[in-house]
UniProtKB/Swiss-Prot annotation:
Ca(2+) 4 binds at S567, D569, K571. Residues 116-131 have a biased composition (Basic and acidic residues). Its EC number is 2.7.11.1. It catalyses: L-seryl-[protein] + ATP = O-phospho-L-seryl-[protein] + ADP + H(+); L-threonyl-[protein] + ATP = O-phospho-L-threonyl-[protein] + ADP + H(+). Residues 446-481, 482-517, 518-557, 558-587 form the EF-hand domain. This is CDPK-related kinase 4. It is a lipid-anchor. It is an enzyme of class 2 (transferase).
Length: 594
């Protein structure tokens, strides 16, 4: 499989341009980030990475310098056969979200000009849309609007100043969302959800502050913190397209800190990209803040989302497969990390379909310059975020504990994935718990740093963790968003901990992820060492029927499972132990080489 190489991220005029939501438009761009810069022949036909909120600040680049972090020459990437394009259903989904009109039907046009509910293509009439949100009504009396500083599909953002109250004379940013564009119940619900998210998440150091929300007959006004330092993308361009490692680490710690926070609240952003991070000021050490939760959503601990949203260059493979969770945000951060360190996009295509094929099939290039000069730990960090298997991808909390970022002394947050792993462990069979205990004794010291931090964040009592420890830890971090996503419901499935405690050794067995360990280069040594422990402490005679029950498979799997049991003593072989740890299905097992 070859590599996809990046291209210019500059504005282009006469080609397909994906919007901030990943949609391709054939119309010329109306907002050029650097209109004075001539179009390069190399950049012709390159989709623009378009911002939802266009930066109001002038580029620091001199005229004639290509405004792009993409320095790698473009190369054509040919496939042996054209795969089905995922672009069409994505475009359709985005059109529905924005309330675009459906395909024409042989029906009379309603004479009434009032908005009606879009029934998604069903024939017949509809109900009038209720666009009354119940927000405050006196925006004009409290704020004086200034110039426009950004514009997107769903609205525009203006500078404003408070006229009265505690915030008198304070400058703010006001996102103005036109009610005329709310042409479906989905688009109305998107606005309600965005406001609810901003309210719940405001207050974290790296989240844009939410102040208030108002409405009138025509618009919704969301009053937020004004970040005057411009976009992260502009800073990347100002530095010639890439960041030195030491500076990239400082940026990524801030991005991961915010992401770990809203993931713990049960929120998935779904559109993380350099344009959606703003600096509070022009200072080099300015604080970075995440913005634009217009595509974000609440997600339950046992839920997978299936609607395809986001920006093409940053979309995760599982999003294209329509089954994803918070891991999709981590892929986007992996793309941002790649750009920060080398100045190129890891996946490129002339069209959205080509970009998506590249995301699904190609591997990022870590061979060309400047990668040979970048530290091995930095490359490992990026690779573990750009793993196409979402189960092997680091969480935000795990990424903060990665050796590459450890010198930055990032404050670690509780990782909700620990709750899901512990829940599975305490509900597992004794045989599986023995296998995981053996694996925990082979965990590398570098990985133990994360587990030790999580153990202490759960505030153990008398050296152990009870159900109350898990409950109180969630309570300490809870916001209204966590209640909306119903994450505390997982505590109802952890009742066995009401009668016992987990010491640190057993916590490691419960909270270790087999897939995370498999992503490490030393996985073979880890598995071998773990099997040696299992041979001494947990391996026993097991029948094919019992093993099938442990794996939750039927009699059709017996021939396969028989190969996992040693004929000499009836115990699990090394192959059987590794497969048993995975809990893989028969289909996935038989498709892998032995």
């Amino acid at each position: 499989m070859g590599h996809c190489y990046s291209r210019n991220i500059s504005a282009v005029e006469d080609d397909e341009i994906p919007t901030g939501n990943g949609e391709v438009s054939n119309q010329p761009s109306q907002n050029h980030r650097h209109a004075s810069i001539p179009q390069s022949p190399v950049a012709s036909g390159t989709p623009e990475v378009n911002s939802y909120n266009i930066s109001p600040f002038q580029s620091p680049l001199p005229a004639g310098v290509a405004p792009s972090p993409a320095r790698t020459p473009g190369r054509k990437f040919k496939w042996p056969f054209p795969p089905p394009s995922p672009a069409k259903p994505i475009m359709a989904a985005l059109r529905r979200r924005r309330g675009a009109p459906p395909q024409p039907r042989d029906e009379p046009i309603p004479e009434d000009s009032e908005d009606v509910v879009d029934h998604g293509g069903d024939s017949g009439g509809g109900e009038r849309l209720d666009k009354n949100f119940g927000f405050g009504k006196n925006f004009e009396g409290k704020y004086e609007l200034g110039k426009e500083v950004g514009r997107g599909h769903f609205g525009h953002t203006c500078w404003a100043k408070a006229k009265k109250g505690k915030m008198k004379n304070q400058t703010v940013a006001v996102k103005i969302i036109s009610k005329a564009k709310m042409t479906s119940t989905l688009s109305i619900e998107d606005v309600r959800r965005e406001v609810k998210l901003l309210k719940a998440l405001s207050g974290h150091r790296h989240m844009v502050k939410f102040y208030d929300v108002y409405e009138d007959a025509d618009n919704v006004f969301v009053v937020m913190e004004l970040c005057e330092g411009g976009e992260l993308l502009d800073r990347i361009l100002a530095r010639g397209g890439r960041y030195p490692e030491v500076d990239a680490k400082r940026i990524l710690v801030q991005i991961l800190s915010a992401t770990a926070f809203f993931h713990l609240q049960g929120v998935v952003h779904r559109d993380l990209k350099p344009e959606n991070f703003l600096f509070t000021s022009r200072n080099e050490d300015a604080i970075l803040k995440v913005i634009d939760f217009g595509l974000s959503d609440f997600i339950r601990y046992d839920q997978r989302l299936n609607d395809v949203v986001g920006s093409a260059y940053y979309v995760a493979p599982e999003v294209l497969h329509r089954s994803y969770s918070t891991e999709a945000d981590m892929w986007s951060i992996g793309v941002i990390s790649y750009i920060l360190l080398c100045g190129s996009r890891p996946f490129y295509g002339r069209t959205e379909s080509a970009i998506f094929r590249c995301v699904l099939r190609a591997n990022p290039n870590f061979e060309d310059m400047p990668w040979p000069s970048i530290s091995p730990t930095a490359k490992d960090f990026v690779k573990r975020l750009l793993n196409k298997d979402h189960r092997k991808r680091m969480t935000a909390a795990q990424a903060l504990a990665h050796p590459w970022l450890r010198d930055e002394n990032p404050g670690l947050l509780l990782d909700f994935s620990v709750y899901k792993l512990v829940k599975s462990y305490i509900r597992a069979s004794p045989f599986r718990r023995s296998a995981l205990k053996a694996l925990s004794k082979a965990i590398p010291d570098e990985e133990l740093v994360f587990l030790k931090a999580q153990f202490m964040l759960l505030d153990p009592k008398d050296g152990g963790l009870s159900l109350n420890c898990f409950t109180m830890a969630l309570t300490r971090y809870a916001t209204d968003a966590m209640m909306e996503s119903r994450l505390p419901d997982i505590l109802n499935t952890m009742q066995p901990l009401a009668q016992k405690k987990l010491d640190f050794e057993e916590f490691c067995a419960a909270a270790v992820s087999v897939y995370q360990l498999e992503a490490l280069e030393e996985w073979e040594q880890i598995a071998t060492s773990a099997f040696e422990h299992f041979e001494h402490e947990g391996n026993r005679i097991i029948s094919v029927q019992e093993l099938a029950g442990e794996m939750s498979v039927g009699p059709s799997a017996y021939p396969l499972l028989k190969d996992w049991i040693r004929s000499s003593d009836g115990k699990l072989s090394f192959l059987g132990y590794a497969k048993f740890l995975h809990g893989v299905t028969v289909r996935s097992s038989s498709s892998r080489p032995r």
